[in-house]
Curated annotation (Swiss-Prot):
Belongs to the somatotropin/prolactin family. GO terms for molecular function: hormone activity. InterPro entries: 4_helix_cytokine-like_core, Somatotropin/Prolactin, Somatotropin_CS. Its main location: secreted. The lineage of its organism: Eukaryota, Metazoa, Chordata, Craniata, Vertebrata. This is Prolactin-3D1. The keyword Isomerase does not apply. It comes from Mus musculus (Mouse).
Length: 224
């Protein structure tokens, strides 16, 4: 998978360094020793996801503080996140009962499903009057990190499959919120931005929780 990152300045450099470091998890030469052990991938992903959740929570919190207004949420029902159709365990017991491969596949589906909406969230926050520069930069950081997270999850998943099909398809839902996000109606636009901030925070937290369980299961044989 080729990553394309369109960032500039210090934030862009930090992200490029992050990607350069984390992409070492896959073989960079023909030598088997160049492949980072799966156990290390889990550790790196766990740290990356934890930090990404902090960023997502910051973006949500800042948007909520600066833009939340009863005028654009009154008489509106919070919609389901576009990833709601992806079957994921809902509690700790279900997580522990789910096979490693199935949990990884669900996490990959969630990550893939955010590639497109994150692009538009970055654009929306960057262009939003009154939004801080840091909020847009954090959203761009989340967007780049999601690509790295996806790369890592796919690497681990591929290694876990003895007879994996080439170019295996993943069943992820399409995002259909662009019209609302680009609406000329300010209330509709802000409500759409709010829901993206809310849902990315929710989904990153979910994947973060799952990777911790899998790391405990795979690396420490559930002794943690």
């Amino acid at each position: 998978m080729q990553l394309t990152l369109n960032l500039s300045g210090s934030a862009g450099m930090q992200l490029l360094l992050l990607v350069s470091s984390l992409l070492l998890w896959e073989n960079v030469s023909s030598k088997p020793t160049a492949m980072v052990p799966t156990e290390d991938l889990y550790t790196r992903l766990a740290e990356l996801l934890h930090n990404t959740f902090i960023l997502a929570a910051d973006v949500y919190r800042e948007f909520d503080l600066d833009f939340f207004d009863k005028t654009w949420i009154t008489d509106r029902t919070l919609p389901l996140c576009h990833t709601a159709s992806i079957h994921t365990p809902e509690n700790r017991e279900e997580v522990h009962e789910t096979k490693t491969e199935d949990l990884l596949k669900a996490m990959i589906n969630v990550s893939i499903s955010w590639k497109e909406p994150l692009k538009h969230l970055v654009s929306a926050l960057t262009a939003l009057p009154g939004a801080s520069e840091s909020m847009g930069k954090k959203a761009a950081d989340i967007k780049g990190r999601n690509l790295v997270i996806l790369e890592g999850l796919q690497t681990i998943y591929n290694r876990s499959q003895a007879n994996i099909e080439e170019n295996e398809n993943f069943d992820y839902p399409a995002w259909s919120g662009l019209e609302e996000l680009q609406s000329p109606n300010e209330d509709t636009h802000l409500f759409a931005v709010y829901n993206l901030c809310r849902c990315i925070k929710r989904d990153i937290h979910k994947i973060d929780s799952y990777i911790k369980v899998l790391r405990c299961r795979v690396v420490f044989q559930n002794e943690c």
